[in-house]
Amino acid sequence: MVFLAGFLYFGMQPQTVEANSSLILEAPTINLTSPIRVIELNDDYTLTSPDRITGLYKAATNNIFLIGHSTTIFSNLKNLKIGDRLTLDNKNYVIKTYKIQKKSEISMSKVLEAKLTPTLTLMTCHGEKISGHDYTERVIITAELEK
C-alpha cells in the first residue's frame, strides 16, 4: 500500500526478512506473538513493511509506529478492542483508540507525531483491495503505556 501524506510518502510492500531486534510484540486477545524488525525510511521516503513479522519505525518522541500486513502477521488486528493489552519489550500498553479510516483521509504526520505519553501506534490495511497490496482503508490503533 502506498499513499502520500504530509511530509511522508509511505509505502508497504511485501518483503520476507528476519527480525533484527530482540523485541517481541504480543497481543494475547488475538493470539499474536511477533518478532520485530526495526525499519528506517528508504531513500524515497517510503517504509517497507516486512512480510510475516512486525516492522517498527521510531516515529517521534514517545511514539513507536508498528506496521504489518493484514494478510499475514496483522490478519487479526481488526479484532482488537479498546482496553485490550499489548506488550512490547516487557512493557504493557492499553489500547485507547481504534479507528478504521479511508486511506485518502489519513494524515501520516498526525499518525507519526510526538505523543505526551509513551504510545504504540499500529497500522495495517483494511477494506477493499485496490491493487497489489493496496487497500481502500487502514486500521489505526493507539495504545498507551500502562501506569
Residue ranges and their predicted role:
Residues 2-147:
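Solvent-exposed, non-transmembrane regions of membrane-associated and secreted proteins
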